UniProtKB/Swiss-Prot annotation:
Belongs to the EF-Ts family. One of its GO terms (molecular function) is translation elongation factor activity. The gene is tsf. It comes from Hahella chejuensis (strain KCTC 2396). This is Elongation factor Ts. It comes from the Bacteria. Keywords: Cytoplasm, Elongation factor, Protein biosynthesis.
Length: 286
């Protein structure tokens, strides 16, 4: 049987909101597989989708640069080890160099960008500051109109590309994406695999109702439709005017959303947590 650690139980609790014993039991039954434990819990308890894996725990900033004619824009993420360094003017100057290079070269290839003198600057900054600095990723969008939005703390940045429309509309939609975090532009972008997995979970939940098969099928179809609407940008209520769907707002402007990119600092990265009390206790014993 797989060993179930306290950190595994803690992560499952944070992602599901369920109690410690329930999470531990689910992990034991899933032989330590957190994703399988979540799927089993959803089937058995009707729990909503869990939070995404990979808590945001790395520091750093995101930055964007948009062309004067709003035809293209770039976004980059640069990580530091601490929030203190993420506010350092030397670090922020380096971030400016990175986003500037990506913009000038119209490139999202981090490895290629670093070969243009940025790697030497990064190494010098690491020596000066005493923390590891990492240029994690970059993206570029180009279209009729490209808008960008950076949240005030420089931890969330969005690019959105439109056919038609204008810069103000693009920025409003980018702000919405930052706030609501849709996973797809349209339900048509959701893979059959994702839908099939959700359908399996919803059917397992609905089967527990004891209702006839045709009623269960209708229940599942309704839940799938709601799920797709919640994760699709065009079907979400616009954050600045909840009475209007984003898709209707875009259509009224004679525009079309063709692409979006949303960066949040550290998403998918988890720094090693150090239990200082345990570390000290171990040293005292040793």
């Amino acid at each position: 049987m797989a060993a179930i650690s306290a950190s595994m139980v803690k992560e499952l609790r944070e992602r599901t909101g369920l109690g410690m014993m329930e999470c531990k039991k689910a992990l034991v039954e899933a032989e330590g597989d957190i994703e399988k434990a979540i799927e089993d819990l959803r089937k058995s308890s009707g729990m909503k989708a869990a939070k995404k894996a990979g808590r945001v725990s790395a520091d750093g900033v995101v930055a964007v640069k948009v062309s004067d004619d709003n035809s293209y824009a770039v976004v980059v993420e640069v990580n530091s080890e601490t929030d203190f360094v993420a506010r350092d003017e030397n670090f922020l100057g380096f971030v400016g160099d990175v986003v500037g290079a990506a913009f000038d070269k119209k490139s999202a290839d981090v490895a290629a960008l670093m070969e243009s003198g940025l790697e030497e600057k990064r190494q010098a900054l690491v020596q000066k500051i005493g923390e590891n600095i990492n240029v994690r990723r970059a993206s570029m969008l180009s279209s009729d109109v490209v808008g960008a939005y950076v949240h005030g703390n420089n931890r969330i940045a969005v690019l959105v590309a439109l056919n038609g429309g204008n810069a103000e509309l693009a920025k409003d939609i980018a702000m919405h994406i930052a706030a609501v975090n849709p996973q797809f532009v349209s339900r048509d972008d959701v893979s059959d695999e994702v839908i099939a997995k959700e359908r399996e979970i919803y059917k397992a939940q609905a089967d527990q109702s004891g209702k006839p098969a045709e009623i269960v099928d209708k229940m599942v179809d309704g839940r799938i439709n709601k799920f797709l609407a919640e994760i699709s940008l065009l079907e979400q209520a616009f954050v600045k005017d909840p009475d209007v769907k984003v898709g209707d707002l875009v259509k009224k402007a004679g525009a079309q959303v063709v692409a979006m990119v949303r960066y949040e600092v550290g998403e998918g990265i988890e720094k090693e947590e150090v239990d200082f009390a345990a570390e000290v206790a171990a040293q005292l014993k040793g």
